[in-house]
Design a protein with these regions (language model features):
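Mobile cap/lid helix-loop segments that gate and shape the active-site cleft of serine hydrolases
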Residues: 59, 198-241
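Primarily recognizes the serine-hydrolase "nucleophile elbow" in alpha/beta-hydrolase
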Residues: 134-204
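Short beta-strand/loop motif that positions the catalytic acidic residue
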Residues: 245, 251-253, 257
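Catalytic active-site module of serine/aspartate enzymes centered on a nucleophile-bearing elbow/loop
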Residues: 295-309
Length: 309
């Protein structure tokens, strides 16, 4: 016959106090974490009037659209966010959290989408985002922004397109019914491609001076024509269009980025400084092509635009 289990011993007073303290600490920490998460969610979901799917043009029968977010207390200034990664663009790229710091500072945000490669070449994509800038400028009064004080922001391919706007934007032919310039007043970019003629250090470098190995169709390089590529690469490289007219530019780049090496940003900065331009490069130590603290740099970018626009 099995013996009855011994009765449970009550906790000693010291152990009881320790257990109670640990429980209270756990509850406090859990409450603090919940409060932090709630505050973070609220911060990145500010109240704003949103217009989605505003058509600014078309390509190959496909409508080209942008979204507009207007804060309750708009400051009359606009930020254009080029939504692009790998020169592909869609609403499912999780971009809206990036707009929050700008909306909270009173900026009207225009999120520009383009037809993705390979359906459109990078040259065509640049033409389309330029068209979006002119579209916004032509309707600036309707949107409550100053057409001469637009900022642009983008990362990776979006950063490349943003720098093309900063270096090559200007008065355009009125083929689309507008004569508004497509140049911006200031630019913030993350890990941008700046020089397609020299991809040294990139995992996309084919080693023969040709186009990025996984983006040949995007540059209309199938089959590869090296002579034609050199011309295209130079035309689509912001580095080769730096002049003293370059608007103030802020660059964030991880020093361990292997897709777009930091040398791309360093060489752009050096060329801009030589031309007498205001370009700042912020190096994110130990970071690759993306990093966890990027939201903090977006907040920093919003403050930087305050001083530039």
């Amino acid at each position: 016959m099995n013996a009855a289990p011994p009765p449970e011993q009550p906790l000693k007073p010291a152990n009881r106090r320790r257990t109670t303290l640990l429980l209270r600490m756990g509850l406090l920490m859990g409450g603090a974490l919940a409060a932090t998460l709630a505050a973070t969610w609220i911060y990145f979901h500010p109240s704003a009037q949103r217009q989605r799917g505003v058509c600014y043009g078309s390509r190959d029968g496909v409508s080209l659209c942008l979204d507009i977010a207007t804060p309750k207390e708009a400051n009359g200034l606009g930020i254009v966010f080029i939504v692009s990664g790998g020169w592909k663009s869609s609403h499912d790229r999780g971009h809206e959290w990036l707009t929050a710091p700008f909306l909270r500072r009173g900026y009207t945000v225009f999120s520009v989408f383009h037809l993705s490669q390979p359906r459109a070449t990078v040259a065509e994509i640049f033409g389309d985002v330029s068209r979006a800038i002119r579209f916004i400028g032509n309707r600036a009064e309707e949107y409550g922004v100053d057409p001469d004080r637009l900022g642009v922001i983008g990362g990776s391919a979006g950063g490349h397109l943003s720098l093309l706007l900063a270096t090559q934007g200007g008065p355009e032919p009125a083929a689309d019914g507008t004569s508004i310039k497509s140049r911006v007043r200031a630019a913030v970019v993350f890990c941008p491609v700046t020089d397609l003629t020299d991809l040294t250090g990139s995992t996309e470098d084919p080693g023969d001076g040709g186009p990025p190995r996984n983006f040949r169709a995007a540059f209309d390089q199938r089959p590869v024509d090296i002579d034609r590529w050199r011309e295209t690469a130079r035309e689509l490289s912001p580095l080769h269009h730096v002049t003293s007219d370059l608007p103030p530019t802020l660059i964030f780049h991880g020093d361990r980025d292997t897709l777009v090496p930091i040398s791309q940003s360093e060489r752009f900065r050096d060329a801009a400084v030589t031309a007498g331009c205001d370009v700042e490069l912020v190096v994110i130590r130990g970071a690759g092509h993306t990093w966890l603290t990027m939201p903090l740099q977006v907040i920093q970018a919003a403050r930087w635009f305050d001083a530039q626009l």
